Amino acid sequence: MVTSSGEVANLSTKNIIKNHYRNTLKFKTIRGKLKVMFDDGKRQESFTLSLRMKKDEAIWLSATLSLVKVYITPQKVSFYNKLDNTYFEGDFSLISKFLGTELDFEKVQNLLIGNALFDLKNERFNSVIQNKNYALTPKRDFELFKRLFLLDPFHFKVKQQRLEQSGKNRLLTIDYPAYQEITGQAFPKNVEIKAEEVNKKTTIQIEYRKITFNENVRFPFKIPSGYKEIKI
């Protein structure tokens, strides 16, 4: 919350968390475009994806000409790549390994819409005002696993979330540099994901375009025959 003088108001930790969930995005479906830039230090790529999402049920991504398709449900992750005739069908371990932290459907959905990855209501947090944002850190964090959540004082959506595994020298930082207002709700305009390990850094930048809510959406997905399965 910002005062009339432009200062960030002092709020209790309880009220900060309450406002975060009070401002959770309300939607049944999402449709739009993503411009994605990928850089892992060895290669750089830029591409556009179509996005369709049904709350708590499905996330669907498709590249131009359906060359790559991704279909995520709470039960499994599936994708295929027509460029190299490969496919994957399995649990969330592939995405978790890629970003260096344990993920499930709810966490992936939260990441995309600007919610905290973890349920802030299930723990006790300390809060301070840091760089004009509300900073939350758990009073008791997981062993060898540190977390930080920065919430924007205007709409209480996530500005940054950091997950650090010092024992494994892993750091996942998810930034939300800008939000846009769509039908009266704050929705990310940009997301920047940085996954760092020893001698390895992967950066993914996402720009949302033409986002609409609550349209009828379909999720066409069928793995072509003859493709080689990716095993992990």
Annotated model-derived regions:
Residues 1-43, 231-232:
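N-terminal leader/targeting segments and the immediate start of mature chains
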Residues 58-106:
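An acidic-aromatic
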Residues 22-30, 42-45, 52, 70, ...:
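Edge/loop elements at the starts and ends of beta-strands within beta-rich repeat scaffolds
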Residues 125-232:
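Gly/Pro-enriched, hydrophobic low-complexity segments
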Residues 29-34, 46-49, 63-65, 72-74, ...:
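Extended beta-sheet lipid-handling architectures
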Residues 96-139:
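Hydrophobic, well-structured mid-protein blocks that either form specific transmembrane helices
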Residues 6-12, 24-26, 30, 52-56, ...:
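The feature marks either
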